Amino acid sequence: MSLILPLEKPALNLRPLLWLLLPLLVLATLFFWPLSLIVEQALRGANGEIGLETFRQVVDSKRFVGALLNTLQIAFFATAGCLLLGSVMSLILVFIPFPGSELIGRVVDTFIALPTFLITLAFTFIYGSAGLLNGALMSLFAFELPPVDFLYSMQGVILAEITVFTPLVMRPLMAALRQIDKSQLEAASILGAHPLRVIGQVIFPAALPALMAGGSLCLLLTTNEFGIVLFIGAKGVNTLPMMVYSKAILESDYTVACMIALINIVLSLGLFSLYRLAASRTGVRSQPC
């Protein structure tokens, strides 16, 4: 007669849960807890009750509406400029090599490591009221006032952001362009395809994932950019990050500042969701930037 022995239950392995607990604890401490404090402060009205009183107050403000429109306008135009300039420069550096092209590529990489205020400071030295360009033009043509004054406007902010964030488009794009099979380009040229047609039908589809990855990163960063707008001091250019700073630091209105910051977070997440939706519609997989 054979005995049927009960199967031993496998011991519960808690080690994976312990490894997961540490990053969750770090996230909760450094991200979720501060975010919950911002949400609580934003939703707490003047009477101490939780509600949407502050939200209605902020949305009805013309200053907030203007800052929101400025933020979106700067973000979209700066991102479009980054995509256009980054695409042209990447195509030249990858497919039209010339002496010094590798050096230029390395210089572009170093731009990412530079603080944004340093680029803005360089713009001030070159295009400012007392900068090199205005000084040279006033000396040559005897102008009484500086003829170049775009730096302290929205156009100056957009140009500075394009200069700062274009390398974020170029890095993934140049890596994608180098992986394109050169035989496809040669075959298209032999068949008599125009260079613009080669770019549109061969290069662009292969580079689309890198373009969308770099463009989405530029869009998020330009939406939340604070240092460039503050350092340039553009007249009449108020953005959501600038409004958060002025409400919290200059006016000590922390409830309104938290509400604007919360709206800015929702705006950033919404823009990122639009990117993910567009990527899924076009069949593009997310790539690291």
From Swiss-Prot:
Can you tell which superkingdom this protein's organism belongs to?
A: Bacteria
**Which PROSITE patterns does this entry report, sorted A to Z?**
ABC_TM1
Q: Which residues cross the membrane?
A: 19-39, 76-96, 111-131, 150-170, 202-222, 254-274
Keywords associated with the record: Cell inner membrane, Cell membrane, Membrane, Transmembrane, Transmembrane helix, Transport
CDD domains given in the database record:
TM_PBP2
GO CC aspect terms: plasma membrane
Q: Where in the cell is it found?
A: Cell inner membrane
InterPro entries, per this entry? Answer: AminoethylPonate_ABC_perm-PhnU, MetI-like, MetI-like_sf
Mind telling me which SUPFAM superfamilies this protein's record contains? MetI-like
GO BP terms in the entry: 2-aminoethylphosphonate transport; transmembrane transport
Q: Tell me where in this chain the ABC transmembrane type-1 domain is found.
A: 68-275
Q: What is its main location?
A: membrane
User: Can the keyword S-adenosyl-L-methionine be found in this entry's annotation?
Assistant: no
Membrane topology type, per the record? Multi-pass membrane protein
Q: What does this protein do?
A: Probably part of the PhnSTUV complex (TC 3.A.1.11.5) involved in 2-aminoethylphosphonate import. Probably responsible for the translocation of the substrate across the membrane.
Tell me which family the UniProt entry assigns to this protein: Belongs to the binding-protein-dependent transport system permease family.
Entry protein name: Putative 2-aminoethylphosphonate transport system permease protein PhnU
Name its species. Salmonella paratyphi A (strain ATCC 9150 / SARB42)
